[in-house]
């Protein structure tokens, strides 16, 4: 196979980009707005006028990239630190921690979109499991006013080690789903008083109907997450921004909009059918909701006289795809389950199929390590395989459009057996294996996609990408990608996490005094670049531990340098049956940007002609 170039430390990038930034007499403010799960090509002046205005009047990052695995916490960690996942250790939304996390429900595979779980993981990894400083933490320590408002999990991640719980301690203002309850991040009396004066409750309202995913017989929600996010916008515009202006010093505000992600996941527009999938009315209402939030923030900046001194960076964490639950090869799809339509893949299909192929007992880490009986699937899809569930040979962390496999004993023979089993399944499209396990035909090493770095959390042994194709009757493949997903959600609902271009093509734009106006950036950019660029805009002193770092997007700045980009393809050696993992990428200097990866014919965006398939309805 072709070995990739070694990624150089981006410290050189940071140093060489200083010419792009003028020395401002007054430091600028910065707002990072994240419309979770927003596909780049879905933004038009009609569907999302506020975001289209930022893109068209500011900088249009038309060649944008989410990091693989394309999940929220993974990409949140990249935006927060400027590092790739091999350094942050946030390999997906559900990871193997190597210990039992009590706040996560006594499991070794916690779902980490949870403040208490993040705090618990921090405690087990020297107080900061990311092992890299976040932009918001550095800004706070540099004297900026700082706040993070929005979706539970990634919002707190931006300053997860600060806490106002001790006298004299500094922290960012954090407002998320848990604010006001026992598991929420505490808020100061100053913020509480301001919220009360503004007529706002001290507890965040629930998602209500937007949180209802339905089941195999009941459609999910038809409501966007409007009331909850309206509350968060009110906190930002009526409390936080006026407070920051009154302090008369620069600020950084992170606003993480759960929509359109939540509406695209849970929508009830397409139960068990591929179309309209994530292009139905509920998903579009979610896009509008996020857009309305951005419009409200920009209006508040205007009203407060802050627009001229505020840079706004808008970037989605990932794209999105419609879920498929179809497979002709999976043994688990041939078993009947009470909660799964006939012949559809059940939640946890990867753990079930591997247990059968490897002839290993399967236990449920989300059910007190109980054995998974015949005809049942793991409650959350995760699985621990081996004779002793407390000392597993193999762990499956279920996530969605891709899954993580851990081998706690670093068993090379088991790794090869697992890969052989994966290659036999039609739902697999691309396999990445820990470099330390050696080269395995049909797979590429984790280092090729920047998943092998200085992370302190356990590294996955194998990352499995699932098959994707373009829904029938679609003219824009990235808008209607369909992917096999290991999830409780149903065929026709929404998911991400795969290496398809539908999931890697996230919306990105920027506007403000330190960005060009009306500029279309042809160069590849990524969510890791967001973190590093934010740090440079704020003139923060960063001391990275890992070397998997993004680059400052100098080409988007007045008088900034414009580097050159090239494209490339990396192919693994073929497996016995001829399958090979192929990675389509671009380069800017030593930086690599990953468009799509998988087996040819099974991943959207990998081939010249996007794979298409007629989908059955159930």
Positions of predicted regions on the chain:
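Beta-strand elements within well-structured catalytic alpha/beta cores of enzymes
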Residues: 27-40, 53-55, 79, 139, ...
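Non-catalytic, well-ordered alpha-helical segments in soluble enzyme domains
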Residues: 40, 52-53, 137-140, 400-433, ...
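Secreted, luminal/periplasmic, and some membrane-associated catalytic domains
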Residues: 69-71, 93-107, 111-124, 162, ...
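Acidic, His- and aromatic-enriched active-site or binding-groove loops in soluble protein domains
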Residues: 85-88, 147, 163-207, 274-292, ...
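Active-site His/acidic residue clusters
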Residues: 157-168, 220, 236-296, 326-328, ...
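Polar, surface-exposed loop/tail segments
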Residues: 429-462, 522, 539-574
